[in-house]
Amino acid sequence: MSNVSLSASAVSRVMMRVCWLVRQDNRHQRIKLPHLETVMVGRSPETKIADKKCSRQQVQLKAECNKGYVKVKQVGVNPTSIDSVIIGKDQEVKLQPGQVLYLVNELYPYIIEFEEETKSPGLESHRKRKRSGSSDPTERGADPEAEPSTGLEPGSNPHQCSVPPKKEKDASIKKESLGHWSQGLKISMEDPKMQVYKDEQVVVIKDKYPKARFHWLVLPWASISSLKAVTREHLELLRHMHAVGEKVIADFAGSSKFRFRLGYHAIPSMSHVHLHVISQDFDSPCLKNKKHWNSFNTEYFLESQAVIEMVQEAGRVTVRDGMPELLKLPLRCHECQQLLPSIPQLKEHLRKHWSK
């Protein structure tokens, strides 16, 4: 009995949990974050980031492997953010599984993954990877909605942004919001109060931070982390998601004069594949910056039908290189292609098209 006890104890002593920093667009190999060790990440050959706005020591990371999070300290001058909430120079916050760390200026998205390693004498190491973004270990963080997307709270006005006003001095609000979305879309899609429509295959919720008067997300119940995980086996599901999106438009916005688009972000920032159903008025206080606009009005936004055709022909979804650069393009009206210098001027310009 004592020998068995000692053997089990020996095995437990070599069981350890490790953390990895993973670039969402897979531009480079993942970076190991040893438990309680400080790791500096920024512009370097390792990250393949050449952007001069990103410092060589942009962030300081320290993994709390036993607690399941990473402490992130912004060291560089330009803003680092988590789920589009800016950390602030020399400020430190926690990065949870399911959240997306944007290294600088809401570019270069990273997520964290935890693995359990067990090393037994005379045996190879056994690893159990925990995917980020959900309580389901098969899922992985995957929309640069500039804020994380979930359903609206009960009683919310779908035409109003539910983001609270910015209070630079109130750091506690920022930190609270970082933790609140740690489970991504999974919680919202399973909350009956947030559901607009559901059937055996999909559920529809209103985007927590709508970028237009009408902005819904269609999500499959099946655990599909992102478009990269989609295969021909999912073709019927993709078609059903598209059909449900069109049904929601007819049921809830049938009298709207605005046209709609259905599509996916090329590099989403939240776990669980989701189809955007969005009206083209872009009349929302949540539409705040160039990244928001370009994520829906450049090739960064993949049309639903185009994705279906791609999967039908190639068996998978291919996203070309350089997608993050599209988010930095000049602001251009999606109706007449006129260039506008700022978001306020773009919004004022868009009003001219509403009456047409």
From Swiss-Prot:
It catalyses: a 5'-end adenosine-5'-diphospho-5'-2'-deoxyribonucleoside-DNA + H2O = a 5'-end 5'-phospho-2'-deoxyribonucleoside-DNA + AMP + 2 H(+); a 5'-end adenosine-5'-diphospho-5'-ribonucleoside-2'-deoxyribonucleotide-DNA + H2O = a 5'-end 5'-phospho-ribonucleoside-2'-deoxyribonucleotide-DNA + AMP + 2 H(+); a 3'-end 2'-deoxyribonucleotide-3'-diphospho-5'-guanosine-DNA + H2O = a 3'-end 2'-deoxyribonucleotide 3'-phosphate-DNA + GMP + 2 H(+). GO terms for cellular component: nucleolus; nucleoplasm; nucleus. InterPro entries: FHA_2, FHA_APTX, Histidine_triad_CS, HIT-like, HIT-like_sf, SMAD_FHA_dom_sf, Znf-C2HE, Znf_C2H2_type. It is an enzyme of class 3 (hydrolase). Keywords: DNA damage, DNA repair, DNA-binding, Hydrolase, Metal-binding, Nucleus, Phosphoprotein, Zinc, Zinc-finger. Residues 207-211, 269-270 are annotated as: Interaction with DNA substrate. Residues 121-175 are annotated as: Disordered. GO terms for biological process: single strand break repair. Residues 182-287 form the HIT domain. The record marks S188, H265, H276, K291 as: Interaction with DNA substrate. This is Aprataxin. It comes from Bos taurus (Bovine). The lineage of its organism: Eukaryota, Metazoa, Chordata, Craniata, Vertebrata.
